[in-house]
Amino acid sequence: MRENNQSSTLEFILLGVTGQQEQEDFFYILFLFIYPITLIGNLLIVLAICSDVRLHNPMYFLLANLSLVDIFFSSVTIPKMLANHLLGSKSISFGGCLTQMYFMIALGNTDSYILAAMAYDRAVAISRPLHYTTIMSPRSCIWLIAGSWVIGNANALPHTLLTASLSFCGNQEVANFYCDITPLLKLSCSDIHFHVKMMYLGVGIFSVPLLCIIVSYIRVFSTVFQVPSTKGVLKAFSTCGSHLTVVSLYYGTVMGTYFRPLTNYSLKDAVITVMYTAVTPMLNPFIYSLRNRDMKAALRKLFNKRISS
């Protein structure tokens, strides 16, 4: 067990995305471009949904909450990375590292459960349209969002506390641009067998929403293919296409990072984490708005209102 005074002075070195200065300069410019787009894009989604009464329904309520989580999610890591690069420093305190890890796990899990809630919403809308307003009532939507936040934080807390109990002696270079649980476990000189088992349990909890999404879309597609109208099938696929794209991007990159043995992790994997920590939150507003006429109309209305005022 580490001494209290040691934990207060312990610092980690964030190696960045690649560890090569020339490439780090490229990623600095990339993040400098990505971060404001992420903030503005997701904030516009939230404002458009709040300002347009036609979008005050469960589907857009869940989307607005997803956009808020994406804003927080990208803000946990990118500002620190930009500040470190600008100041020529790569250090992060032990407390700052634990805080970053906690919010990454909590927000990542919350994001995945909201995606599952959105899939459930689509399944109910398509397979049980007559009961939609009853099942997806305002109270149900609030419970879905609250449950997502509770599960996300409940999954993050034990991992953070367990990591706080570890001893770190010798190499303190984190093979990533933020404090992730995998490189931290590899740095520890404590017995991490229990911690690794808990990490994979956490991965299992994180995978539950994916199972819910798969079940929801099996229900959607089984209902859709029973519809004789080709127009109805195309409309259903158009409605679900954006969500499926986001789910594929998010879970595809996350699974590439965490669904494998701890010993296989290296700095090369930091490039994969850029996809779900930075790129996916930036793309979400575009994916959900470009193919959605109601969202595009709400955004135009929002812009016109700002210009006229």
From Swiss-Prot:
One GO cellular component this record assigns the protein to is: plasma membrane
| Main function | Odorant receptor.
Give the glycosylated residues. 5, 264
Listed A to Z, the keywords are: Cell membrane, Disulfide bond, G-protein coupled receptor, Glycoprotein, Membrane, Olfaction, Receptor, Sensory transduction, Transducer, Transmembrane, Transmembrane helix
Entry's localization field: Cell membrane
To which species is this protein native?
Answer: Homo sapiens (Human)
| Residues of the signal peptide | none
Question: What is a single molecular function from GO for this protein?
Answer: olfactory receptor activity
* Disulfide bond annotation, renumbered to this chain: 97-189
Q: Which residues lie on this side of the membrane: Cytoplasmic?
A: 50-57, 121-139, 219-235, 291-309
SUPFAM superfamilies, per the entry = Family A G protein-coupled receptor-like (SSF81321)
**Superkingdom to which the source organism belongs:** Eukaryota
Q: Which Gene3D superfamilies match?
A: Rhodopsin 7-helix transmembrane proteins (1.20.1070.10)
Question: Which family does the entry's similarity section mention?
Answer: Belongs to the G-protein coupled receptor 1 family.
Q: How does it sit in the membrane?
A: Multi-pass membrane protein
What name does the UniProt record give this protein? Olfactory receptor 1A1
